[in-house]
């Protein structure tokens, strides 16, 4: 699992129990918070006493004007606290940049300089500004505790970055976020390996607590990209001529602004290796997916990117300076990282530094939204998170197809499966010459249906309806009359273009399900390995350090594909068995028993199709039995009358 990527939709905002300051204004405390802050101020007083040099002497010859100034000047707040008191409180709250400014002001007016130096020193450490922290250490040259704090922070940074060359980019990234008044006091970036990182909790986090706030000025939104010369040019044709207009716009921004000092701190931290994304697979890695329909998705995605790239080269000056490979990487950054948000009721997409470092996990630990009042992107905990625990986002409920194609990883226990089943309408189907006239063009002769392990009602109904059309052997016009008779409840376009054919009879439905089972079995036969062989391979290798990451992803994808096909084969077998029931009570009894044991997901098909067909069949047989009985009775009566006449 690789880091970074957002939820596909905006999360529902909840009321926060944690109050944080406006990110563009000084932190104003309530009277309750002021009272609570006394303990924090006391702790800082003790810390300063314990860490101060015993030989340090106070300057006794301060000017009277300075002395008066320090007692009269407050922090432009209504809480009647001095600069140093506000600095301490803001430090405790995690607003290090604001705390630093107040500490520096306190030093400037020579008020509580020892405390102010100590607070400033700690602020620089928290903001990873080691050089400035060392300067403040010089003011306390004999202070061993401060030296130890500094060395520990340096060591923490080096250990956390895992390799020295990552250190400058990592530090610069955090420094810039702090300078822009970003808020994440309880979070730290952790590197598990050279290429895999996550976000950990430095302190205990409570449910509903705001754990991150990234100001709007740090976000790269569609509006930011549109405000450039090339962005304005792209906007003239993006929706008409590009396959992925928004992604292309933001990708262009990444390419053109690569060396822009405003964003360089963020761009420098973006990954350079994209070999885990399928569009960059080697021939050997493509062979892992032999006969998988996923190969077609990769080709189509790359083709769409190529078309967009060609169009941008044609329309945008100097775009040819960027290679197609570089454009693809920029597109992958966007597709795997953007957040869909709403700012002042305007929907937009945005890159959000730091927030995009959260890895994926379901169920979610956090929710995110843009807060118009705070003018910032907010991440909020939806459960308690312990110290040292990794903090996750949820990228949404997606299949491994979507995860691998757009994010470069798969999930081992993903209950969402997908298989694109392609059906080629040809002369092997009955009444081919008559039926082909109903297709708009030759492309309609080949249709693909996404089989889903969640068994979505609309998808399976569309597939089975289409098969009813293909397998129908009587006068096709009668079938369309049946469709058109339902137009009161059925959109005409859906009826004609999507072949929404209602169940005809049990015999026809048996044909349809038998054919669907046959199609799924044929797809399974294409693979060089069985699902049992794939599962065995994965189980034997998943804990090995040298288990190739891309091979792992391909194995999990193949297992997922085959699982879906097997699931639909089992569905067909089960429903065929039900359709052979003679009485509706037999169906109800069996389904009630099996539902408790299996809790299968295709209840709606049983209810809407099978029960109705079996009921109609049973009713028809009862009517036939009644007619036969009446016929026999009449025959008997006629015979009796004939005998009476003979007598």
Residues covered by each model-derived region:
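Long, positively charged leader/targeting segments at protein N-termini
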Residues: 162-218, 223-226, 257-632, 638-647
């Amino acid at each position: 699992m690789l880091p970074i990527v957002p939820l596909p939709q905006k999360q529902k905002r909840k009321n926060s129990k944690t109050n944080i300051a406006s990110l563009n204004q000084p932190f104003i405390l309530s009277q309750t918070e002021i009272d609570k802050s006394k303990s924090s101020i006391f702790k800082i007083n003790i810390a300063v006493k314990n860490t101060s040099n015993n030989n340090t002497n106070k300057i006794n010859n301060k000017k009277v004007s300075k002395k008066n100034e320090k007692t009269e000047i407050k922090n432009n707040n209504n809480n009647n606290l001095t600069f140093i008191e506000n600095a301490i409180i803001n430090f405790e709250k995690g607003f290090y940049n604001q705390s630093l400014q107040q500490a520096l002001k306190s030093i400037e007016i020579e008020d509580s300089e020892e405390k102010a130096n100590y607070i400033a020193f700690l602020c620089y450490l928290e903001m990873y500004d080691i050089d400035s922290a060392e300067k403040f250490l010089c003011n306390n040259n004999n202070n061993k505790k401060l030296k130890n704090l500094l060395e520990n922070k340096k060591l923490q940074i080096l250990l956390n970055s895992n390799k020295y060359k990552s250190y400058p980019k990592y530090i610069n990234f955090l420094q810039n976020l702090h300078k822009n008044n970003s808020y994440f006091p309880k979070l730290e970036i952790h590197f598990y390996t050279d290429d895999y990182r996550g976000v950990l909790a430095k302190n205990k986090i409570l449910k509903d607590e705001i754990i991150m706030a990234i100001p709007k000025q740090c976000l790269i939104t569609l509006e930011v990209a549109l405000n450039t010369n090339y962005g304005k040019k792209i906007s003239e044709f993006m929706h008409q001529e590009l396959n992925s207009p928004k992604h292309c716009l933001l990708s262009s921004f990444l390419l053109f602004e690569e060396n822009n000092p405003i964003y360089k701190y963020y761009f420098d931290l973006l990954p350079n290796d994209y070999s885990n994304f399928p569009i960059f697979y080697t021939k050997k890695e493509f062979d892992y997916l032999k006969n998988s329909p996923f190969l077609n998705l990769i080709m189509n995605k790359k083709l769409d990117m190529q078309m967009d790239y060609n169009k941008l080269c044609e329309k945008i000056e100097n775009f040819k300076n960027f290679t197609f490979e570089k454009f693809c990487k920029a597109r992958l950054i966007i597709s795997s990282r953007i957040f869909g948000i709403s700012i002042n009721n305007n929907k937009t997409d945005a890159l959000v530094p730091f927030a995009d470092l959260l890895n994926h996990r379901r169920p979610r630990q956090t929710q995110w939204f843009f807060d118009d009042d705070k003018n910032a992107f907010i991440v909020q905990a939806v459960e308690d998170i312990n110290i040292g625990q990794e903090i996750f986002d949820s990228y949404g409920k997606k299949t491994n197809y979507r995860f691998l194609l757009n994010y470069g990883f798969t999930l081992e226990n993903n209950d969402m499966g997908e298989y694109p089943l392609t059906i080629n309408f040809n002369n092997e189907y009955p009444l081919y010459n008559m039926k082909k006239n109903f297709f708009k063009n030759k492309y309609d002769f080949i249709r693909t249906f996404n089989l889903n392990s969640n068994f979505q009602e609309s998808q399976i109904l569309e597939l089975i309806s289409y098969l009813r059309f293909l397998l129908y052997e009587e006068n096709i016009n009668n079938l369309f009359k049946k469709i058109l008779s339902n137009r009161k409840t059925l959109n005409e376009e859906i009826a004609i273009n999507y072949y929404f054919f209602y169940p005809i009879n049990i015999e026809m439905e048996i044909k349809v399900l038998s054919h669907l089972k046959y199609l799924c079995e044929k797809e399974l036969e294409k693979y060089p390995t069985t699902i049992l062989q794939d599962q065995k391979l994965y189980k034997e290798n998943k804990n090995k350090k040298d288990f190739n990451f891309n091979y792992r992803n391909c194995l999990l994808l193949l297992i997922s594909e085959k699982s879906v096909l097997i699931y639909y084969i089992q569905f067909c077998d089960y429903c065929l068995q039900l359709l052979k029931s003679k009485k509706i009570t037999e169906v109800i009894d069996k389904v009630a028993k099996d539902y408790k044991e299996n809790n299968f997901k295709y209840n709606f098909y049983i209810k809407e199709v099978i029960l109705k067909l079996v009921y109609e069949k049973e009713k028809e047989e009862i009517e036939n039995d009644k007619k036969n009985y009446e016929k026999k009775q009449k025959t008997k009566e006629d015979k009796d009358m004939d005998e009476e006449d003979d007598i």
